[in-house]
Swiss-Prot record:
GO cellular component terms attached to this protein's record: cytosol
Any Pfam family: TGT
Name of this chain's protein: Queuine tRNA-ribosyltransferase
Cofactor note as given: Binds 1 zinc ion per subunit.
Organism: Clostridium tetani (strain Massachusetts / E88)
General function of this protein: Catalyzes the base-exchange of a guanine (G) residue with the queuine precursor 7-aminomethyl-7-deazaguanine (PreQ1) at position 34 (anticodon wobble position) in tRNAs with GU(N) anticodons (tRNA-Asp, -Asn, -His and -Tyr). Catalysis occurs through a double-displacement mechanism. The nucleophile active site attacks the C1' of nucleotide 34 to detach the guanine base from the RNA, forming a covalent enzyme-RNA intermediate. The proton acceptor active site deprotonates the incoming PreQ1, allowing a nucleophilic attack on the C1' of the ribose to form the product.
Pathway listed: tRNA modification; tRNA-queuosine biosynthesis
Designated gene of the protein: tgt
Family statement drawn from the similarity comment of this UniProt entry: Belongs to the queuine tRNA-ribosyltransferase family.
GO molecular function, one term: metal ion binding
Origin organism lineage: Bacteria, Bacillati, Bacillota, Clostridia, Eubacteriales
Assembly and interaction partners: Homodimer. Within each dimer, one monomer is responsible for RNA recognition and catalysis, while the other monomer binds to the replacement base PreQ1.
Enzyme class, broadest EC rank: transferase
Keywords in alphabetical order: Glycosyltransferase, Metal-binding, Queuosine biosynthesis, Transferase, tRNA processing, Zinc
EC number: 2.4.2.29
């Protein structure tokens, strides 16, 4: 159940109760595609850096180790030793972006695994069964992530099919949650809004999925090539359609500036591989923007990555030392920078929640955007 605690303009401060604990929103979900954050970050680390929700990938976990293996191990929470909420995406995005030789039909999608080339079928029922085996807290509906740009006719047909798939997802989840051997009988379902950059299609689809009375809703199909202005325009159009008593998730959008703009438009949930991926390459976020620790100017820099940051890297090591680790190709370099970036994001969300509660989110947003626009 989602409770709206406070609004500051359109920005929402909420609390989402789940079978695996409470999620304070707005929230950034830390992405562990295969049940782990890339960069040697453990579940214990995630708790220490303030992670509330871990996001894993249905497509990848289905391929390895296999969702049946995870079910036999008691579900993903037990498998990865994580007792807080987990959201699994449906696998749709990966099917349409990674998989080879796709064939879309009404029943689902036939594709070849990007790992070993074997032929696989995934449709709404299969996605729900896999996510039920994984036993995540929140399951995402199976949808088609529409390529950008696409013709209006293609988008209309795709959205209509995604709606039919959502109805099948809901029916299958209700069935799975009633079975005696289901691990998480209270698994939640979020529906995904699609429609490309066609505002009227987006709005009509949003109204349709709201009528299905799901546990939450997501805006999908963005951050796939459109401009930031186009993305914000889509959010402006559809966010007001979604109810204030349900969480709203903007999928795959993760620049700090994007997060602030989307929070200002009523979004609650975020995820992105960006902080971990950047960290693995020495690109780290600070209160004054992003820096590249590989740059020569940091060779003798005795300061922490970000002055005042309480992450494990900043509390114990200098920019110069971490740069040395990267140059020496030591794994610790990646680990420290990934931990820092995830801490930065989790702390940003905590500060956003405080700003909404304190009625100063507009000022907070303007200050952050101004600071990030300069050179660190």
């Amino acid at each position: 159940m989602y409770t709206l605690i406070k609004k500051c303009g359109n920005a929402k401060r909420g609390r989402f109760e789940t079978p695996h604990g409470t999620i304070e929103t707005p929230v950034f979900m830390n992405v562990g595609t295969l049940g782990v954050i890339k960069g040697a970050v453990s579940s214990m680390d995630l708790k220490e850096i303030g992670c509330q929700v871990e996001l894993s990938n249905t497509y990848h976990l289905h391929l390895r180790p296999g969702d049946e293996v995870i079910k036999k191990m008691g579900g993903l929470h037990k498998f990865m030793n994580w007792d807080r909420p987990i959201l699994t995406d449906s696998g749709g995005f990966q099917v349409f972006s990674l998989a080879k030789i796709r064939k879309i039909q009404e029943e689902g999608v036939y594709f070849n695994s990007h790992i070993d080339g074997r032929r696989i079928f995934m449709g709404p029922e299969e996605s729900m069964r896999i996510q039920s085996n994984i036993a995540s807290t929140i399951a995402m509906a199976f949808d088609e992530c529409i390529p950008n740009p696409s013709t209006r006719e293609y988008v209309e047909n795709s959205v209509a099919r995604t709606t039919r798939w959502l109805e099948r997802c809901k029916k299958e989840m209700d069935r799975l949650n009633s079975l005696p051997d289901t691990i998480n009988k209270k698994q939640m379902l979020f529906g995904i809004n699609q429609g490309g950059t066609y505002e009227d299609i987006r709005k009509a689809h949003a109204k349709t999925i709201v009528d299905m009375d799901l546990d939450g809703y997501a805006i999908g199909g963005l951050a796939v090539g459109e401009t930031h202005e186009e993305m914000y325009r889509v959010i402006d159009e559809v966010a007001p359609i979604f109810p204030d008593n349900k969480p709203l998730y903007l999928m795959g959008v993760g620049l700090p500036s994007n997060i602030l703009e989307a929070v200002d438009r009523g979004v609650d949930f975020f995820d992105c591989v960006l902080p971990a991926r950047n960290g693995r390459h020495g690109h780290v976020f600070t209160k004054y923007g992003k820096i590249n620790l590989m740059n020569a100017k940091f060779e003798l820099d005795g300061n922490p990555i970000d002055e005042g940051c309480e992450c494990p890297a900043c509390k114990h090591y200098s920019r110069a030392y971490i740069r040395h680790l990267f140059k020496a190709k030591e794994m610790l370099a990646m680990r420290l920078c990934v931990l820092h970036n995830l801490y930065f994001y989790n702390k940003l969300m905590e500060d956003i929640r405080k700003a909404i509660e304190g009625d100063y989110f507009k000022e907070f947003k303007e200050e952050k955007l101004h600071n990030w626009s300069g050179k660190a």
